[in-house]
Amino acid sequence: MIIYLHGFDSNSPGNHEKVLQLQFIDPDVRLVSYSTRHPKHDMQHLLKEVDKMLQLNVDDRPLICGVGLGGYWAERIGFLCDIRQVVFNPNLFPYENMEGKIDRPEEYADIATKCVTNFREKNRDRCLVILSRHDEALDSQRSAEALHPYYEIVWDEEQTHKFKNISPHLQRIKAFKTLG
């Protein structure tokens, strides 16, 4: 089972395309939708939905995957639910760059302070990070610097922020999922 979390643009047709691409790894791909506008509510909702899926799951190596803001959530929810994560261009600093787009961007900073202390150290090697060198929305170098000490970083030379085509990375994702 692969759980897919969309980014801020929840209505993007690219979400469906990514789900279809992920089905080459596992036919059971589940998209979990969330508001993107209310961080504390989103966290509760995502934890509840992912936990529900894991309770009914027969796959002993589930994976959670997210793009952009979905990558922010996939890393955290995956850690809290003890499943491996794959994140594409994760938005690591939504409290800085979501101003004017969501109701309370400061809630992201609050979530960070209330999260498990040093969670990335405890999550070491359980997240695969795929970053675009041509991310027009986020500073991918800053993301790499924050995540490199804990996770493997894969650089993509073609894609933009929304990562429309993930197919060049499917074999690596499949191998990462298999490690369970």
Swiss-Prot record:
Pfam families: UPF0227
InterPro entries reported in the protein's UniProt record: AB_hydrolase_fold, UPF0227, UPF0227/Esterase_YqiA
SUPFAM superfamilies assigned to the protein according to its UniProt record, in alphabetical order: alpha/beta-Hydrolases
Disulfide bond positions: none
Domain of life: Bacteria
Gene3D superfamilies in UniProt: alpha/beta hydrolase
Family: Belongs to the UPF0227 family.
NCBIfam families: PRK04940.1 (NF003431)
Protein name: UPF0227 protein YcfP
Lineage: Bacteria, Pseudomonadati, Pseudomonadota, Gammaproteobacteria, Enterobacterales
